[in-house]
Regions:
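Charge-rich, low-complexity N-terminal segments
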Residues: 1-47
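Short linear sequence elements within intrinsically disordered, low-complexity coil regions
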Residues: 19, 23, 33, 53, ...
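Amphipathic, interaction-prone secondary-structure segments
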Residues: 31-80
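An exposed acidic His-Trp-rich patch
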Residues: 63-116
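Well-ordered alpha/beta subsegment
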Residues: 108-131, 136-144
């Protein structure tokens, strides 16, 4: 079965549109947990889910992803882990934290370094992710005391 794809033009439109959170606040996940909330774009049919997962063993490892609800396509991901290694389709190795941005050709398989990301800066990294996904009305995020 072929994977669901969208055109690059449509992906760019969805990535670049302004979005608003449908919830006013969320709790950042504790170790080994995830949390998810929805955001809406310019039109009500443009619905997205943002998921935040935090590692169980390494609490400095966490992932954030934004996907289209109607087809499950991941448009944007941020993987935060200083020892992470991702291999791009051309064989290039990306070490450390990195971004995935949807492309028509590769889906989410291509990564590029997240040079502006510091592992311990949970608040700033979450804001960077929401800004990159153009969420102009984000929820208030409550962080666990250990962060």
């Amino acid at each position: 079965m072929a994977a669901v794809k969208i055109s690059q033009k449509e992906a760019d439109r969805l990535l670049n549109m302004l979005k608003h959170s449908l919830v006013s606040e969320i709790n950042f996940p504790s170790k080994g947990d995830s949390t998810e909330f929805n955001v809406v774009g310019d039109q009500k049919q443009d619905l997205f889910a943002i998921n935040i997962f935090r590692g169980k063993i390494n609490s400095l490892k966490y992932n954030m992803g934004a996907r289209i609800i109607k087809n499950g396509i991941l448009l944007l991901e941020l993987h935060i882990n200083p020892s992470n290694i991702h291999i791009n389709p051309d064989g290039e190795k990306i070490t450390g934290s990195h971004w995935h941005l949807y492309s028509e050709e590769y889906g989410r398989l291509w990564a590029f370094p997240a040079e502006d990301i510091q592992n311990e800066q949970f608040t700033e990294n979450t804001i960077s992710f929401l800004n990159k996904f153009n969420v102009i009305d984000p929820p208030v995020i409550h962080y666990p005391p250990e962060l």
